[in-house]
Amino acid sequence: MANIAAYKKGWERTLRREKALQEKRRAEALKIAEGLRDILVQEFKVSRVILFGSVLKKHGFDMDSDIDIAVEGLAKKSYFKAVARLMMQSQFPVDLKPMEDVRESVRKRIAKGVALYEERASS
């Protein structure tokens, strides 16, 4: 039985380390997402930036996760330039979704996200 107890303790330690690493990666991704927001707003003049997906889930951001960002107001001709620019600034893959082009199923996932930026209407 001693071998099983030692194995269990070792496995629990490994799981705690993995969970801590995942949370650290998630915190880094959230910080990077703020910088990506700034690029999208300042360089590409988008009117709205929404963070969604696994990065918002406390235990959902794993080693294979990306940063999911939806935007409104991105010129179609600027899409690939924006993706390239974001990828250069991020150690994580970035999945950029123009709201004007997404399917309803994706829209529902985006609706559960967090707005990082919304252009104020001028009065």
Q: Which stretches of residues belong to each language-model region?
A:
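Glycine-rich beta-strand-to-loop/alpha-helix junction loops that act as flexible
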Residues: 51-54
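Catalytic core of pol beta-like nucleotidyltransferases
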Residues: 1-45, 57-63, 73-123
